Amino acid sequence: MAVNVFTILQLAVFAAIVLNVNLHSVSADSKGTSDSQDSTKSIKVDFCETNCTKTDGGWTGCTGDCICVSVGDSIEGRCMDFG
């Protein structure tokens, strides 16, 4: 009787492992390219020749179609064109 219980437990563990591996492979296959990664919806970004700084009234230094982009709370940034 003890052998039968041990065999049943082994089969149950084996079935759980196979089921887990099967579910993992199915979910990994379902992760295709999302719409946000579609190359037809990408934007073109160019660096402009100037940098920019934050003053009391706002950001200054960018010309033309360039806008100032900064990181965090920095008072210095880089002018970029999102044409």
Curated annotation (Swiss-Prot):
Compartments, as annotated in UniProt: Secreted
Disulfide bonds: C48-C66, C52-C68, C62-C79
Main location: secreted
GO molecular function annotation: C-X-C chemokine binding
GO CC annotations on file: extracellular region
Glycan-linked positions: N51
Entry keyword annotation includes Glycoprotein: yes
Swiss-Prot/TrEMBL keywords: Disulfide bond, Glycoprotein, Secreted, Signal
Cleavable signal peptide: 1-28
Function of the molecule: Salivary chemokine-binding protein which binds to host chemokines CXCL1, CXCL2, CXCL3, CXCL5, CXCL6, CXCL12 and CXCL13.
Name of the molecule in the record: Evasin P1124
Organism of provenance: Ixodes ricinus (Common tick)
Lineage of origin: Eukaryota, Metazoa, Ecdysozoa, Arthropoda, Chelicerata
